[in-house]
Amino acid sequence: MARALHAGAISVADSLSGSRLDGGVTDQRPPFKFSALTRVWFSDTDAQGVVYYGRYLPYFDHARTEYHRHLGSLQIEGAEFVMRASNVEYHAPARFDDPLECFVRVSRIGRTSAAYDYATYRLPDQALMVTATQTVVLIDVATRRPRPIPDEVRALIRAFEGDDLAE
């Protein structure tokens, strides 16, 4: 039996069959305003039958990518974000075929860096699986040196995150 993700929203089964995998705006878990769905693949699990700790990083990457796709800031010409730091806390084990919803937000934006917060929940019981904070730095692809985040990208993030964004 499928259960709704959000009031009036599509079911978990419908969501994971394609229409919501790219992510979407949500008011389910403030201060998060965006989430992306995924499912635990067999290759994500370890010998204990649970998600191997390092496999959560691709879930965060998926959510972060879809967040920027939604904002229209997926690519910045001549620049790319690189990972500076990642801090992950594990709260409960996810298992093969569990549907997961990964919430993402930009919590801070600096001159050349941004901090992302994540919270991933198992569906449909809404059990918290993992939380994380990651810091990325924008670099020039030619020099591999940090460069300022463009004002247009900052404005898109600021408009979406509102007062929850630290600068």
Spans of features found by a protein language model:
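Terminal targeting signals and extreme-terminal segments of soluble enzymes
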Residues: R3-E101, S107-A115, A119-E167
